[in-house]
């Protein structure tokens, strides 16, 4: 603990007591914020792990299925099938505030189907159709995964900042204020006793 360099006066004592009350209120609010951020963070981490497992599993299975589908078609024909995107997608990224943390919210809009696309269910095979359908169904999961991972990163940063502020108040500011208040109270008591002794001597 470090005693603050202030004059031991009653006015200073009152000021320090107000500062201590404010620091203690701030400490409680920050601890509550940290705990709630941690609760949400843990929930998001669980969702992130589950989503990642699902997406990776789909991608691994789909790559195997694609290898099989590709082996059943001419490689040049496969390249032509995917040479032009079959649809155009707009990605929208909005912002949401969660406990003073600005996090992304993503959604997409299919703006048009590309009529010039080489891919069609007539020119492909059923195996390739399955691969194509699975990849289309994965887009929403991939967007949510990106959203959750970014949110986790931002929340982890905020948790660390809040933790440092809580520790600063708990282990430095509040003890220093308390120590200084105690010191001033002792000094004022000493001054009162000395003053009382002088009065008694005068009498």
From Swiss-Prot:
NCBIfam families noted in UniProt: PRK00373.1-5 (NF001546), V_ATPase_subD (TIGR00309)
Organism field: Streptococcus pneumoniae (strain Hungary19A-6)
GO biological process: proton motive force-driven plasma membrane ATP synthesis
PANTHER family, per database record: V-TYPE ATP SYNTHASE SUBUNIT D (PTHR11671)
Keyword Ion transport belongs to the record: yes
Recorded family membership: Belongs to the V-ATPase D subunit family.
UniProt keyword Oxidoreductase present: no
Reported function: Produces ATP from ADP in the presence of a proton gradient across the membrane.
Name of encoding gene: atpD
Protein's UniProt name: V-type ATP synthase subunit D
HAMAP family for the chain: ATP_synth_D_arch (MF_00271)
Alphabetic keyword roster: ATP synthesis, Hydrogen ion transport, Ion transport, Transport
Annotated GO MF terms: ATP binding; proton-transporting ATP synthase activity, rotational mechanism; proton-transporting ATPase activity, rotational mechanism
Pfam families, per database record: ATP-synt_D
Top-level division of the source organism's lineage: Bacteria
């Amino acid at each position: 603990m470090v005693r603050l360099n202030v004059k031991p006066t009653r006015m200073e004592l009152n000021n320090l007591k107000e500062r201590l009350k404010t620091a203690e209120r701030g400490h409680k609010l920050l601890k509550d914020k940290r705990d709630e951020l941690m609760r949400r963070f843990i929930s998001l981490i669980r969702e992130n792990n589950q989503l990642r497992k699902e997406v990776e599993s789909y991608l691994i299975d789909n790559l195997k299925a694609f290898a099989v589908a590709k082996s059943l078609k001419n490689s040049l024909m496969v390249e032509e099938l995917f040479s032009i995107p079959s649809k155009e997608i707009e990605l929208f990224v909005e912002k949401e505030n969660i406990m003073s943390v600005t996090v992304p919210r993503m959604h997409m809009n299919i703006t048009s189907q590309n009529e010039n696309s080489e891919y069609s269910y007539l020119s492909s095979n059923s195996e390739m159709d399955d691969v194509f359908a699975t990849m289309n169904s994965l887009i929403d999961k991939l967007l949510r995964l990106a959203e959750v991972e970014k949110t986790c990163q931002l929340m982890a940063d905020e948790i660390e900042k809040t933790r440092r502020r809580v520790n600063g108040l708990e282990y430095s500011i509040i003890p220093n204020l308390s120590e200084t208040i105690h010191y001033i109270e002792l000094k004022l008591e000493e001054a009162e006793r000395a003053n009382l002794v002088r009065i008694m001597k005068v009498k």
